[in-house]
Structures are given as C-alpha cells and as structure tokens.
Amino acid sequence: MSPKITHVNPETLHKNPAFSQAVLVEGGKTLYIGGQNGVLADGSLAGPDFATQTEQIYRNLLKILHSVGASQKNLVKQTIFVVKGQNLQAGLAAAQKVWGPFPAAISVVFVEGLGQPGRGVLIEVDAIAVVDA
C-alpha cells in the first residue's frame, strides 16, 4: 500500500516553498535516516565549504531513498544541524539545486560543532521518510 502524504499549511500560518508546517501520513512504513554529512562514498568530505557539503548531503539522501524504492516525495521530516557562522540561506539554495520542490517539515538547529571535531563538517541532516508498506 502506498502511503498518503499530505503537506499541511494552514492559511493562518506563514507559507514557504522550502518547507511544510506539518506533514500528515496515512499508511506505509517509516524509514529513519541517520545524520548525513556531506561526504563522498570513500568517506572524504565533498568540499570544505557549506554549499558543497549541503549539496552532497542531499545527493546522499536521494541515494538512500532510491535504495528503498522511494524519492524526495516520501521524505516527511528533516532536522538540519548547522555549525554557527554558516549562511543558512546559501545552504537552503544549495539543497534546492539537488532536491527540488519537495517541502518536508523541517527544524533547523545551530550548533557549536558536530560529531567529527576538526574535520571541517559544517552541516548534518537526519530525516524521516514514509515508504510503501
């Protein structure tokens, strides 16, 4: 059974094409995606800058989703951890180049650092998707 995913954006709340205020899911299985960094298949960082790392994260998310027969439309929630000092708007623009117009519910958290100190990791994204049952 294919899940029914409805993006909820009440008229009385702010609208933004980059995210939904809430996502209602009926049916399907839940896929929990652990924190993704902007790394290549060999584990090296895709680049030292925020935009390059962000683009790679969304490429990696697509690979994970495709591996279970899903796509961007199945992603319902993202938590985005950004190292303080990064330009969030530049990161969101970089993500959209890879991801397109699929607005999951999101939370953004600015942090002092991420789980790989000294490596130069500037962003991490974990996510939840709903896939066919």
Question: Residue spans of the language-model regions?
Answer:
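N-terminal presequence-like segments and the immediate start of the first folded domain
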Residues: 1-59, 63-76, 82-133
